[in-house]
């Protein structure tokens, strides 16, 4: 079945290559673009909320519409093309700058994962999105090169939404794999691959972020798409790695699939979107993080990077559960049980945490660093917010709750 699927994917790619217009490529500097994900440890961070906006990362951008905007689709819809273009262009040019990349390097990081939506490279007629993000992604690659960082380009939003989350660009029903959406996604992926696969700084491209198999994404169809994405990258540059999301399935359940290929599994780990997890003690949070490594990532036959995780121990951050939704932690989300108070945890800085909260946050972060480096490494979510305590790496670093050197430990050997 998969052999036949691979043949179909290659045929589709040949048609893409024949019909596609020339796409500018990010220049090479003569250095190798490879990073050995089988032997080297990824230590990095995501640039969430920049080229794909999210209400909880930049709430002021969404609040400025006067209400009703719940994702980038509705943000652009409410503002209209001209105003959306102006607001988003201002955001892209100011939210992340070269100094951010310099600070990442100073923190000992070696990777940055940069989300981008399909509409930036393969817009679809009739949709409200605006484009222009790709120029900033090009600039980011230049900044990363200067800072000595490798880049993972992440296709974060797919046509129809691959997960129904606001981070896909369009909150609501999952319609990816309906109609022509998979082919449209491949067109977007191919545009990114042709632009970046031969860069000396982009070592990997992610096929699609968080396709939601429990939510209805067909796993066999997803695998077919992965075959096509791998063929595309390999055709352009065999040393460029394909990152594949586990689709919210146990990462070891993908064993045997594409084994031996230049691929890395991407798994995401949060302990705040489930009431059972929110009720745990700090000791249990640590044990849960460690068990992700021992029971799952270490059991994979491929490199595994924990591509998203957080220092937050609550879901209190404003709009984290979506505009219009409150928090499970304080019992205001639907009919959940109250576990604690969100005061001081919805907005602001970890500087305002109590001494115990600070200690628990540092301990939890260190446990995750230890656990995720037992396999192939990690990418923290996210580098910068407008004030989401526990989620903002810059804020955590400034307050010594994230190690200022990735190997520095105040709480060593928690997973031993």
UniProtKB/Swiss-Prot annotation:
Q: Which family does it belong to?
A: Belongs to the glycosyl hydrolase 5 (cellulase A) family.
- Catalysed reaction(s)? Successive hydrolysis of beta-D-glucose units from the non-reducing ends of (1->3)-beta-D-glucans, releasing alpha-glucose
Q: Look up keyword Translocase and say if it applies.
A: no
The entry's protein name is Probable glucan 1,3-beta-glucosidase A
Q: Which organism is it from?
A: Aspergillus niger (strain ATCC MYA-4892 / CBS 513.88 / FGSC A1513)
Instruction: Provide the assembly information.
Output: Monomer.
Which molecular function terms from Gene Ontology are attached? glucan exo-1,3-beta-glucosidase activity; metal ion binding
SS bonds (residue pairs): 290-415, 316-342
- E.C. designation(s): 3.2.1.58
Query: What top-tier enzyme class does this entry carry?
Result: hydrolase
Q: Which Gene3D superfamilies match?
A: Glycosidases
């Amino acid at each position: 079945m998969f052999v036949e699927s691979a043949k179909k994917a290659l045929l589709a790619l040949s048609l893409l290559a024949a019909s596609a217009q020339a796409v500018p490529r990010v220049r090479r500097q003569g250095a190798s673009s490879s990073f050995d994900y089988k032997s080297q440890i990824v230590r990095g961070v995501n640039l969430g909320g920049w080229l794909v906006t999210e209400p909880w990362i930049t709430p002021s951008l969404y609040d400025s519409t006067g209400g009703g905007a719940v994702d980038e689709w509705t943000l652009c819809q409410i503002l209209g093309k001209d105003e959306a273009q102006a607001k988003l262009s201002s955001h892209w040019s100011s939210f992340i700058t070269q100094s951010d990349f310099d600070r990442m390097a100073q923190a000992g990081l070696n990777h940055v994962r940069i989300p981008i939506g399909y509409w930036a490279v393969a817009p679809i007629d009739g949709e409200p999105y605006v484009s222009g993000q790709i120029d900033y992604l090009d600039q980011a690659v230049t900044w990363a090169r200067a800072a000595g960082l490798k880049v993972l380009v992440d296709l974060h939003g797919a046509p129809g939404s691959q997960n129904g989350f606001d981070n896909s660009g369009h909150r609501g029903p999952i319609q990816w794999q309906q109609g022509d959406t998979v082919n449209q996604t491949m067109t977007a992926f191919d545009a990114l691959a042709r632009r970046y696969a031969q860069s000396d700084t982009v070592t990997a491209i992610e096929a699609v972020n968080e396709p939601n198999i429990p939510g209805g994404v067909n796993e066999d169809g997803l695998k077919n798409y992965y075959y096509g994405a791998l063929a595309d990258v390999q055709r352009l540059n065999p040393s460029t790695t394909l990152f594949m999301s586990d689709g919210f399935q146990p990462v070891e359940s993908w064993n045997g699939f594409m084994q031996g290929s230049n691929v890395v599994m991407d798994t995401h780990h949060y302990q705040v979107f489930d009431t059972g997890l929110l009720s745990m003690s700090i000791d249990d949070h640590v044990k849960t993080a460690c068990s992700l490594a021992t029971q799952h990532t270490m059991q994979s036959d491929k490199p595994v990077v924990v591509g998203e995780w957080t220092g937050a121990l609550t879901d209190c951050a404003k709009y984290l559960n979506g505009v219009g939704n409150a928090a499970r932690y304080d019992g205001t989300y639907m009919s959940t049980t109250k576990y604690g108070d969100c005061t001081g945890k919805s907005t602001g800085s970890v500087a305002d945490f109590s001494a115990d909260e600070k200690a628990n946050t540092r301990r939890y972060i260190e446990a995750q660093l230890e656990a995720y480096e037992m396999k192939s490494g990690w990418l923290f979510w996210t580098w910068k917010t407008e004030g989401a305590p526990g989620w903002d790496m810059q804020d955590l670093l400034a307050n010594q709750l994230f190690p200022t050197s990735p190997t520095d430990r105040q709480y060593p050997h928690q997973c031993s």
